[in-house]
């Protein structure tokens, strides 16, 4: 009995030392005792428990990146007011809250972008984005008050200077498809960039009022979109890692384009983009024996336009350059596709 009383007294003294009971306080929470024991454990191990201040304002997010950004000193506005408004509207947020300054709106936009980054960027309309970029260029020109001088060319389309002519490319085209893949890729790269440059020069040579019209902006946006679509293809050509089946088809297309056989080039394009056979639907592999549709699933029969979005885009860009080539380097109507369509 004495042992039990001594143990109860020891426990009571331990609680009084930890300030859990004593005076008018006769009860305590188990969580308080656990917290005290945890704190003592960390102190014995050489760590210090950091107590959260009750007066601290509740954080709007547990994102450490956001807390770090908000804790920094005030940074200057790196975006214009128009850009801030555009980004807020894209996210369905109000462009200004009551009593909010331009800088506070900018800070709110930064907070929104960190908390909810754009996850549907790839689903945007590329042509609309190119149109918006061209509109912004003309708007910046108007705001700056520029007059019609040589400086207006800064808003023209980018021209790829290949320092070559169509005659030189036609000579290079005679060597296409003879087994030298690296040389073929270099020739394809030159031809595509040459056509982009020809297209850009023609658009830059237009009158200023034509450039600012709806049709003029649409033509410029289409050229910009095509150039952006072809960037992955240019990268593969530069690194010499273009897939063999795609390379073979594009080689045939470029070869026929340089020979001004646009009907044959279009047939080669359809062969690459659509293929001979549709994708098989249903069961293609049961047990150890492949079914009939299985044997058609290889590079020469499938539709590359269905592979992924990147391939679809540069295949579409290639078709536009085929049309541009037919427009500027014409031949007999019988060898053209949709003659005088442009």
UniProtKB/Swiss-Prot annotation:
Which UniProt keywords are given for this protein, alphabetically ordered?
mRNA processing, mRNA splicing, Nucleus, Spliceosome
**Matching SMART domains:** SFM (SM00500)
Gene Ontology annotations of biological process type: generation of catalytic spliceosome for second transesterification step
Q: State any GO CC term.
A: U4/U6 x U5 tri-snRNP complex
Q: Name one Pfam family in it.
A: PRP4
Q: Which InterPro entries match?
A: Prp18 (IPR004098), PRP4-like (IPR014906), PRP4-like_sf (IPR036285), PRPF18 (IPR039979)
SUPFAM superfamilies per the UniProt record, alphabetical: Functional domain of the splicing factor Prp18, PRP4-like
Q: Which Gene3D superfamilies does the UniProt entry name for this protein? A: Functional domain of the splicing factor Prp18, Pre-mRNA processing factor 4 domain
The record's subcellular location field reads: Nucleus speckle
Predominant cellular place of this UniProt entry's protein: nucleus
Instruction: Say yes or no: keyword Nucleus present.
Output: yes
* Subunit text: Interacts with the spliceosome. Part of a complex containing U4/U6 snRNPs.
Q: What does this protein do?
A: Participates in the second step of pre-mRNA splicing.
**Which protein, by its recorded name, is this?**
Pre-mRNA-splicing factor 18
Organism in which the protein naturally occurs: Xenopus laevis
> What is the gene called?
prpf18
């Amino acid at each position: 009995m004495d042992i039990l009383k001594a143990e109860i007294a020891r426990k009571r003294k331990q609680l009084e030392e930890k300030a859990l009971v004593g005076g008018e306080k006769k009860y305590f929470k188990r969580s308080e005792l656990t917290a005290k024991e945890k704190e003592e454990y960390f102190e014995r191990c050489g760590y210090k428990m950091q107590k959260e201040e009750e007066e601290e304002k509740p954080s709007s997010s547990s994102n450490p990146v956001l807390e770090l950004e908000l804790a920094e000193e005030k940074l200057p506005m790196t975006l214009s007011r128009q850009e801030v408004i555009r980004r807020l509207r894209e996210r369905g947020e109000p462009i200004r809250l009551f009593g909010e300054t331009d800088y506070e709106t900018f800070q709110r936009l930064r907070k929104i972008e960190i908390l909810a980054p754009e996850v549907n960027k790839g689903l945007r309309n590329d042509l609309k984005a190119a149109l918006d970029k061209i509109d912004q260029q003309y708007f910046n020109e108007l705001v700056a008050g520029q007059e019609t001088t040589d400086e207006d060319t800064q808003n023209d389309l980018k021209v790829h200077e290949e320092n070559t002519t169509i005659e030189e490319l036609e000579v290079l085209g005679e060597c296409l498809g003879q087994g030298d893949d690296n040389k073929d890729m270099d020739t394809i790269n030159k031809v595509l960039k040459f056509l982009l440059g020809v297209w850009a020069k023609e658009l830059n040579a237009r009158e200023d009022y034509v450039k600012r019209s709806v049709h003029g902006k649409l033509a410029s946006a289409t050229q910009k979109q095509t150039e952006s679509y072809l960037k992955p293809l240019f990268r593969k050509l530069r690194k010499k890692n273009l897939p063999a089946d795609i390379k073979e088809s594009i080689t045939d297309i470029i070869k026929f384009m340089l020979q001004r056989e646009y009907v044959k080039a279009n047939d080669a394009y359809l062969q690459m983009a659509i293929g001979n056979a549709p994708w098989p639907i249903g069961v293609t592999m049961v047990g150890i024996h492949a079914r009939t549709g299985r044997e058609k699933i290889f590079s020469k029969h499938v539709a590359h336009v269905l592979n992924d979005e990147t391939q679809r885009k540069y295949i579409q860009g290639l078709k536009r350059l085929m049309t541009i080539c037919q427009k500027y380097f014409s031949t007999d109507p019988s060898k053209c596709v949709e003659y005088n369509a442009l």
